[in-house]
């Protein structure tokens, strides 16, 4: 089973309603049937894809932005990956503040080799954000290898970016 925070929150909500689900936060859920479910109150997690998209948008537009109530602890490695792209931000409580930044530079490894960003099952990087990282990288100083491992053909829009002047090498 998927174990992203969204699945975890759904399982916890169902348990509060009377379900019997164990193995939450693992890749194996065990569900015991129950006669009925009751009601509960629940607050949905913010969409981590939207949060990542707004971080990328602020960086590319060199704009100051505060993203409120991001559920920072449930973003996994997303903030760290943006930091590796050279994007400065601050965690302010449960908000992310991105200051105006004239440019950003992709980190390289200590030996000078190119940084790699790759998608992976949770707690790895969600594949839905790879396209955001790719577009953000077109405006950065430096180089990055973006490796799409989980799905085929999701980055085939790069030919359009190349037509607009992006320096991208697509390997299949």
Regions found by a protein language model. Give the residues of each.
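Short, structured segments at the rim of ligand-binding sites
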Residues: 1-172
């Amino acid at each position: 089973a998927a174990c992203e925070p969204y699945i975890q929150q759904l399982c916890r909500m169902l348990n509060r309603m009377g379900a019997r689900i164990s193995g939450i936060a693992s890749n194996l859920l065990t569900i015991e049937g129950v006669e009925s479910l009751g009601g509960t109150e629940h607050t949905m997690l913010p969409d981590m894809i939207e949060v990542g998209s707004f971080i990328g948008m602020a960086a590319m537009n060199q704009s100051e932005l505060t993203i409120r109530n991001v559920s920072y602890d449930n973003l996994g490695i997303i903030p760290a990956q943006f930091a590796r792209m050279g994007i400065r931000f601050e965690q302010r409580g449960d908000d992310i503040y991105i200051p105006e930044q004239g440019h950003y530079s992709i980190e390289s490894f200590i030996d000078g080799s190119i940084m790699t960003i790759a998608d992976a099952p949770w707690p790895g990087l969600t594949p839905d954000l790879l396209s955001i990282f790719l577009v953000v990288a077109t405006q950065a100083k430096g180089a990055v290898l973006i490796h799409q491992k989980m799905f085929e053909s999701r980055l085939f829009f790069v030919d359009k970016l190349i037509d607009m002047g992006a320096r991208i090498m697509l390997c299949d």
